[in-house]
UniProtKB/Swiss-Prot annotation:
It holds the Pfam family Hfq. Keywords: RNA-binding, Stress response. HAMAP family: Hfq. It comes from Haemophilus influenzae (strain ATCC 51907 / DSM 11121 / KW20 / Rd). The gene is hfq. GO terms for biological process: regulation of DNA-templated transcription; regulation of RNA stability; regulation of translation, ncRNA-mediated. RNA chaperone that binds small regulatory RNA (sRNAs) and mRNAs to facilitate mRNA translational regulation in response to envelope stress, environmental stress and changes in metabolite concentrations. Also binds with high specificity to tRNAs. This is RNA-binding protein Hfq.
């Protein structure tokens, strides 16, 4: 596993496993919402009324609807707080 994914994979997996709704902001400003169904090195499969395959290189930010606890290399990481009013960042 690449060093850059040592945080990314456990974080995305916690969001997937706990079925936490997420807002995904793309680099072009578009906001997508749904639950992470699956992911790999290059894409995230986002489920809402339809499934969308989102390429990671197009993603700016992933914002969970609530805090999530995740583990990184068997070390517990403090819960990540959901960001409120993130829409102002995209404007």
């Amino acid at each position: 596993m690449a060093k850059g994914q040592s945080l990314q994979d456990p974080y995305l997996n916690a969001l997937r496993r706990e079925r936490i709704p997420v807002s995904i902001y793309l680099v072009n400003g578009i906001k997508l919402q749904g639950q992470i169904e699956s992911f790999d090195q290059f894409v995230i499969l986002l489920k809402n009324t339809v499934n969308q395959m989102v390429y990671k290189h197009a993603i700016s930010t992933v914002v969970p609807a609530r805090s999530v606890s995740h583990h990184n290399n068997n070390h517990h990481t403090a819960p990540t707080e959901a960001v409120e009013n993130v829409e102002t960042q995209a404007e």
